[in-house]
Amino acid sequence: MKFSERIIEWQNLHGRNNLPWQTNDPYKVWVSEIMLQQTQVSTVIPFYENFMQSFPDVLTLSKANLDEVLKNWAGLGFYRRARNLHQTAKIITDKYHQVFPDNYEDLVALPGIGESTAGAILALAFNKKGTILDGNVKRVVSRYLNVENNPRELKKSIKPFLYQNSPKTNYRSFGQGMMDLGSLICCLLYTSDAADEE
């Protein structure tokens, strides 16, 4: 069984399949990916649900006052994310007529959307090949390749590995599976030094 097939099978059996942003709506995937930067899933869920109540689509977000967006973001921190979200919503509304671009180049040109977020939108919303490079995915790959203690080797190896081991279809399940495996099973290891610092 191929690496990608194992990840997809694991995802279908054990992964998180009921998160509120698990949809093919790129707006919802995008908002969740921005919120999840530096923030745990359990923390994001109530903020995401409240944000969607106030801004259910990209047009509503683009027309909102920035102060209103920041008020709805309060408690998540990293307010630059909210400002970029608002600015990008305006661009998607004006330039793309409220339709999210479904290609890497156009996505990474938008404020606040980097390589990993673009990969997540492509894979999770459009079911297209997209490379998700969040901490969970990096941890899975680093342990699989046995380069966990060699960040330089991981940086050199991760993209070729993911490219070569991505499935031919079902990018959504593969991407979600890699993130879930890293979050639920292949977790961060805490050393006694780290515990002493807390």
Label the predicted regions.
Residues 190-198:
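Single conserved hydrophobic/aromatic residue that forms the stacking wall/gate
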Residues 3-189:
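Catalytic cores of DNA base-excision repair glycosylases
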